[in-house]
Amino acid sequence: MIVKIYPSKISGIIKAPQSKSLAIRLIFLSLFTRVYLHNLVLSEDVIDAIKSVRALGVKVKNNSEFIPPEKLEIKERFIKLKGSATTLRMLIPILAAIGGEVTIDADESLRRRPLNRIVQALSNYGISFSSYSLPLTITGKLSSNEIKISGDESSQYISGLIYALHILNGGSIEILPPISSKSYILLTIDLFKRFGSDVKFYGSKIHVNPNNLVEFQGEVAGDYGLASFYALSALVSGGGITITNLWEPKEYFGDHSIVKIFSEMGASSEYKDGRWFVKAKDKYSPIKIDIDDAPDLAMTIAGLSAIAEGTSEIIGIERLRIKESDRIESIRKILGLYGVGSEVKYNSILIFGINKGMLNSPVTDCLNDHRVAMMSSALALVNGGVITSAECVGKSNPNYWQDLLSLNAKISIE
């Protein structure tokens, strides 16, 4: 797919894309209780999660009703995913808790991602692995409900272990610091608490004391990270939008913090009663910010930094190298094509903002990364641009291009 973007001003009201992080967690919750997801958007990552719970005996009706099995067991000995790292990393400890032998594989983007920390951790508790990357054969059953794991590679392992300990009727996780992307661990804990489980997080230790979980019926709430690209598009193009279907921002730093971050950079950005109100200003200020607890915000912050008056620094970026693309290099490459300079330092990137009227009109490839395409599309709204392999947005938000059209973007899709 090729998307041609012409100078446009973004305006209107848009419903936030469903949170794939929350959708995947709710789908995995169906291992324990009935889950009814209304109007579920079938992004590639969500389809991976559905495929995974089916392999464990969950009955799925119309991709909306999820009924837990009477007994959890591995029904399929080979599980083929596409590209959902969240699904993969949460699934591994769940499989280990159920026990048996199973092989997992996925597309090339997941094959190149390391699984070192979860393999190292679970190898100490009765699990055998065929390698440290996909394709991966897992054999055995967890021999302990007290797990110790390093927290520096991915928080998704920790979230998966919380599910695993519910299978094992409770236990504890000791996380060896540093703890990266802590906000996503808190998201998982908040979800279990909401549905009746007792999960406590003290310092670096999580205690799980399962209770019977209540059923869930409803629509998946909006995703601040994905919604932030609509906000970025409005701010870059000189427009203004209202984004609906969003939960109230939490106190801890996470994807929802983008509302405050954009405000600190000089934008009109405010949350009120489930809506995010965004309006462009004539100029934006640079920012220095650590995104280690919410790395998916890197692209949107980089996008606004590109037209800020000065030098911005995004810190805590090391794990961006093991996303769908090497996002550190992707940011450098895409910004460079638009005429924006950047410099990578140890665990940070400097972005040298320019007047937006000086942005180029390049042809950019999405580099097999949905967030790269979304950042590039926002910058292209100023002076135009072309995005190739634009179907990559389907990984998280298959409606993205149609949503931009509804917000008055002038684009053509080939």
Swiss-Prot record:
Subcellular location: Cytoplasm
PROSITE patterns for the chain: EPSP_SYNTHASE_1, EPSP_SYNTHASE_2
Gene Ontology terms describing biological process: amino acid biosynthetic process; aromatic amino acid family biosynthetic process; chorismate biosynthetic process
EC number per UniProt: 2.5.1.19
Keyword Lipid biosynthesis carried by entry: no
Main location (coarse class): cytoplasm
Protein name in UniProt: 3-phosphoshikimate 1-carboxyvinyltransferase
Organism: Saccharolobus solfataricus (strain ATCC 35092 / DSM 1617 / JCM 11322 / P2)
